[in-house]
């Protein structure tokens, strides 16, 4: 039995899996070895053969979960984990060679903590426009800038995190949050789990020296993608509030009307600007307001139709 496991779920990851799998092949093995679990979440591209061809070079178990949803896929993989530490990541992440050894060392050095996060930095697959570096929120790319040490649960992010198996216990990822095939999904898939674990008494630690690279594709370097991300994150904040009691309070109607009026005024003022960054910054609040509104409406409908 392996000493620790690495688990990720992938849907149509053919564009980013090759560099990720190359990096996984170069990993230093921790004492006791390791197991890699990849869950193909209904891919329609060449993800399945890409994974199969690496099984001879990696301690890789490939599972299939056709029901769409990242958390659905992760839950399907949890039954296959081995060892006392589980590292979670995504299909577009390049870890450093000492990744497994570093997480093992960290877990051994911090016995009072059960949830661990590493730093995340972007690896641009195309040069980012200047306005993105100036104006785009780093969180939209899962780009972290935290100090090492104890940290609050919301700062543990899915591309680079580990959880003690004993803390995980019978907990599973909530399948009603996170990527699910819809453009307007609610973000926060791993955060929801970490918040539950923290509520059960498990503490979080961040290690700034365990750095994984997040592959950023050209399609993510557009205002359209970033605004969709703003919308999704706003939905996620409200969804987390419903699931964990940790979301934003509802605005009084008059205040909400005022926020909309201000957002529309800024958008109109900047619509003819020659600076795409200025246009994005003007459009972002409106995208977030719409995400917040749509999620609250969806929850209200759910309550009305509940038995």
Label each residue range with its predicted role.
Residues 160-163, 167, 171, 179-210:
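A short, conserved alpha-helix in the catalytic core of glycosyltransferases
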Residues 65-81:
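Glycine-rich, basic loop-to-helix element that forms the pyrophosphate-binding segment
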Residues 40-49, 93:
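A conserved acidic beta->alpha catalytic loop
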Residues 98-131:
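Conserved donor NDP-sugar-binding/catalytic core segment of glycosyltransferases
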Residues 13-26:
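Short, well-formed alpha-helical segments that are part of the catalytic scaffolds
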Residues 135-154:
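Short, flexible, basic/aromatic active-site loop/helix in glycosyltransferases
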Residues 86:
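Short aromatic/hydrophobic "clamp" motif used to bind/position activated sugar donors
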Residues 228-235, 245-307:
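Non-catalytic, C-terminal membrane-associated alpha-helical segments of glycosyltransferases
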